[in-house]
C-alpha cells in the first residue's frame, strides 16, 4: 500500500504523448464552488460591458464590511481616505490615483470591481485573495469615501443641516487642532 504506482506533481510521463503527468482540465469543467450563476456579481459586467450599480442592496452593514476590508487590503497604498497617500507611496513607491478625481468619481462600479479583481497599471490583481462579496463591499465603501470628500451642504439631509452650524455641546471634545 505504501508504494503504489503514481506520479509526483509535474513529473514526466512516458504514458501521455505530451510527456507530462499533470493533465489539463477538460474544456467546460468547473471546479467545485466556482460555478458562476450571476456574471455581474462575479465580474462587474453585464453582456461583457462594465456595468454600474451593485448586484446586491447597499446597506450600512455592507459599507462597514467594505471599510474593514479596505483597511486591510487597500489603505496601505490608497490611503485611509482614498487620496493615494498611503504608507507604501510615502516610502518611494508609485502613488496610486486618488479616488476623488473626476475620472474615478464617474467610473462605473463595474470598473472599480474589475480593477480590484484583475489589477491595472502598477496595481496587482486581488481577485484570488478577496472574494467577490468583499470586493463589492469595498466598492460600496469607496463610493462612500468619494461622497465624504466631495459633499456639499445640499447633500446633507435637511434634518441634519442644523447640526452643521450648531455650537458644540457643553463638555464635548474639541475639534481636531482645537485646544483643550
What are these regions (language model features)?
Residues 91, 116-117:
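Short, flexible turn/loop "capping" segments at secondary-structure junctions
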Residues 10, 39, 75, 121, ...:
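A generic secondary-structure boundary signal that marks alpha-helix termini
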Residues 79-105:
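Histidine/lysine/aspartate-rich catalytic loop segments that bind and position anionic ligands
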Residues 5, 81, 120, 146-149:
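A general structural signal marking secondary-structure boundaries and capping sites
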